[in-house]
Amino acid sequence: MKIASSLTIACWIVTAAAAWAQDAQSVVDRISNHSAVRNAQQFVDSDHDRVIREIIAINEVAAPPFKESERAKLFAQMLRETGLQGVEIDPEGNVLGLRKGTGSGPLVAIAAHLDTVFPEGTDVRVKREGNRLLGPGVGDNSRSLAVLLSIIRALDEAKVQTTGDILFIGDVGEEGPGDLRGMRYLFQKGRYKDRIRMFVSVDGAGSGSDIVNGALGSRRYHVVFRGPGGHSYGAFGLVNPTYAMAKAIDRLSKISVPSTPRTTYNVGVVGGGTSVNSIPNEVWMDVDLRSESPQQLHKLAEEFIKQMNSAADDENRARSTNQGKISVEAKVIGERPSGITAVDSPIVKLAAAAVNKFGFSPTYSVGSTDSNLPISLGVPAITVDSGGSGGRAHALDEWINVEKTNSVRGINLVMTTLLALSGVQ
């Protein structure tokens, strides 16, 4: 009886999912055939040269981690120039602008992050070679910011009336050390925190066929090993924090983790010491732990801390502690929640239907993006590409291809997805 019941439920779920997929496609088809939406898509084509100019202008205002303010001011001004009303920069540094709908639909937020991974002083000038734009951050995420601007202009030019309000956002703190601080403020303290019903992050160049519906969780540590230190010759035989850290790294490298759900670890940066002929007082490392599963991430973090302490204990047993012992301190410097927006949820089905409409087959993936935060809070969220193509993200020779056909198609795909979520009058 239980087996039959389970099979019945399973069949119902499959049938319901298939029915919803068909319904989502009909929604997207209807929106795509709307005369105002067709006019908006034609405007995007005519607006493309301006998009390229704006990509360059945005990119050439540096936005290192925690220093996005100048780019935020520029983007806020660009939003105002589209005619968007009530543009503001919130206390965390996010740029916000609301496009009002009829009030009968959900509030949909669409965001592109302002910050880059590149430190202050990086040459962020853009070089153009034919259809290629080259410059650090040009694809991640200057293009996406320019795409939001083009979508606003297109909707206004074509007089597209959405049922739901659309909140356009240029947010801070998406990249590494930022630890999603812009999203944390938006969803935990910002004035729209209880109103956002769906969230779309536009991040990176690409055709738009991939839908990031999984949030890759991470926990990052700054680990410090301390000891008494001393002269390399005169104090030889004392405990050495470098040896303890080396043992810790070796122990970390031997921790077994599952391939599904994918779980990883990495020692990314090491430092410490004062001179070649000194036993250091202090050495440190920065460690990145990641998993698609909250449970696996927690399990890995517990094992990691255990091995750090064990490595310090081993060094204290191996050498003299008459001047002091090795101690270890692991401080969390970043934490991103994990989770998933189900493939059969309305937001994913509508995004997939839009992908189909533009001649692609949707794929689904897991990533560490602005969507992590809303997903963890139960807000339906996805991350999509901004169109075109590109490569070498996070490298000084980062590039995007702004060939018009693929670039415009990608912008219109993002816009269609957005309109499917907000609804069109």
What are these model-predicted stretches?
Residues 1-9:
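Bacterial N-terminal signal peptides that target proteins for export
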Residues 132, 137-216, 258, 277:
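Acidic/histidine-rich catalytic neighborhood of metal-dependent amide-processing enzymes
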